[in-house]
């Protein structure tokens, strides 16, 4: 720690000794107080009166309007610590913002928060002795995966968006096309480097309480400086990208198709190397899949499923394309895999709901029929566009218990996503979220009636849930442990920074 940094922390600390009148003035104008403190500390920052504010507060999610007090742009660890000092002096929460994608805008924090942009933390390094990759807290999916592939011919599971923040999507569960046989991005993590609320840097390794908490609730405990993950060499140089067209099915046939896929996935005929995303918004009902086993075996592997689907709809068809492994990565996550920063931000005004189904409570045909009838078939809006899918999970999750990570995802079999995008990208209908919640409610009721607990997905946070609902769906019985760990690593609640952050007990 150099003397300049020490002097700057001292200068910031003197603000704690300011007169009561000054403290009162700071409380009345938190943004100005934060800007003054950050400027004194030598950390670049913006507040709402600055010309770049609109650009800096633009995220992927357009439905939720963000309102932080200030954003700091630290260029190194010392400046992250100074940013934390300023936030504590102003008695405001801190929200680390990774790659600034922020699917549900939670990266921009609660109103009045200090957002710490991690954009400068975009380094990547590879340890050939362990085959582990370390990436900064501000990296995007595309550039990191391309670096790893171009330089080392290796891969690790990741979400299906090249521009998405890699750290945030990985600690939020993450689910990708190779997750059935390699695990989720979160399952592949080896360690995380945190800066805690008081500027202390901790390397939390697998097996530690803090690492466990990071796997599903990472943004609630500190600033992620870097993340280390295990990597894998593909078994084959090529992979098979395939599509299934189930045709124009009614709700009964659509439900039967889902159960046919489920039965196939649980049979000895389905290898973990096969992934499938099946459409919820239809008809027609289609699937996009990826096969990472021996390409020569694909026709034999898929045959039992094709036979089952043809028995439901005689017009069911399968088409396939064999691609070099990296080309498959681009097919999965988009052209941004070959572009700086993973391409462009884009964005929509949308509301997402997500549920996971486990092997302990697989879908019944009646439940699947309720899902289709109450959502995509019942949908009747002209100001919203429906969207939805069922990701086949299963695979290696059979060996995971809910208590293994903060996010309870043991034995997950399906990841179901149901959402609606506003036709007007600048706003969302006032009754839109209520309408969409009403559509999925019969399916939720059917799950509960069948004895299944409602489970969610961290990366697809349902912003309209109460604390009792989201804590149960995401963390289950792990929630009490998470709150206890909060008292150890964030006793001042600095990182109680959004609606679904882990609170103090």
Where on the chain are the PLM-derived regions?
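Fungal secretory targeting signals
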Residues: 1-27
């Amino acid at each position: 720690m150099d003397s300049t940094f020490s002097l700057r922390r001292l200068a910031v600390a003197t603000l704690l000794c300011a007169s009561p009148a000054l403290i009162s003035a700071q409380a009345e104008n938190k943004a100005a107080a934060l800007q003054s403190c950050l400027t004194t500390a030598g950390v670049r920052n913006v507040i709402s009166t600055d010309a770049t504010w609109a650009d800096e507060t633009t995220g992927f999610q357009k439905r939720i309007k963000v309102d932080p007090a200030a954003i700091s742009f630290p260029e190194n660890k010392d400046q992250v610590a100074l940013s934390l000092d300023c936030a504590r002096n102003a008695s405001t929460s801190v929200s680390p913002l990774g790659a600034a994608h922020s699917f549900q805008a939670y990266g921009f924090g609660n109103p009045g928060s200090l957002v710490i942009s991690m954009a400068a933390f975009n380094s990547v390094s590879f340890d050939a002795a362990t085959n582990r990759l370390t990436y900064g807290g501000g990296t995007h999916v595309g550039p990191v995966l391309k670096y790893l592939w171009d330089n080392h011919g290796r891969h690790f599971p990741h979400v299906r968006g090249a521009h998405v923040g890699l750290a945030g999507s990985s600690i939020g569960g993450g689910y990708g096309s190779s997750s059935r046989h390699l695990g989720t991005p979160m399952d592949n993590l080896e360690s995380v480097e945190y800066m805690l609320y008081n500027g202390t840097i901790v390397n939390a390794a697998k097996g530690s309480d803090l690492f466990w908490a990071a796997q599903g609730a990472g943004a609630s405990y500190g600033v992620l400086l870097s993340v280390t993950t295990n990597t894998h060499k593909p078994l084959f140089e090529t992979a098979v990208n395939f599509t299934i067209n189930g045709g124009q099915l009614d709700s009964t046939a659509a439900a039967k198709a889902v159960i046919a896929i489920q039965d196939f996935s649980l049979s000895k005929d389905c290898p973990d190397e096969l992934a499938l995303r099946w459409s919820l918004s239809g008809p027609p009902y289609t699937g996009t899949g990826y096969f990472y086993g021996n390409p020569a075996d694909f026709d034999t592997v898929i045959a039992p499923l094709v036979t089952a689907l043809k028995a439901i709809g005689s017009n069911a068809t399968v088409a396939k394309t064999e691609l070099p492994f990296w080309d498959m990565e681009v097919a999965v996550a988009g052209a941004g895999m070959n572009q700086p920063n993973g391409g462009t931000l884009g964005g929509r005004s949308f509301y997402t709901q997500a549920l996971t189904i486990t092997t302990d409570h697989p879908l019944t045909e009646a439940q699947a029929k309720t899902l289709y009838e109450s959502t995509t078939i019942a949908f009747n809006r002209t100001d919203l566009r429906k969207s939805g899918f069922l990701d086949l999970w299963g695979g290696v999750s059979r060996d995971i218990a809910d208590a293994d990570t903060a996010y309870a995802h043991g034995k997950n079999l399906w990841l179901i996503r149901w959402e609606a995008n506003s036709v007007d990208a600048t706003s969302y209908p006032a009754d839109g979220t209520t309408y969409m919640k009403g559509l999925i409610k019969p399916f939720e009721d059917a799950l509960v009636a069948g004895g299944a607990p409602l489970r969610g997905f961290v990366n697809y946070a349902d912003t309209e849930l109460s604390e009792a609902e989201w804590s149960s769906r995401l963390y289950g019985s792990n929630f009490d442990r998470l709150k206890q760990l909060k008292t150890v690593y964030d006793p001042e609640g600095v990182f109680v920074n959004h609606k679904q952050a882990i609170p103090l007990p």
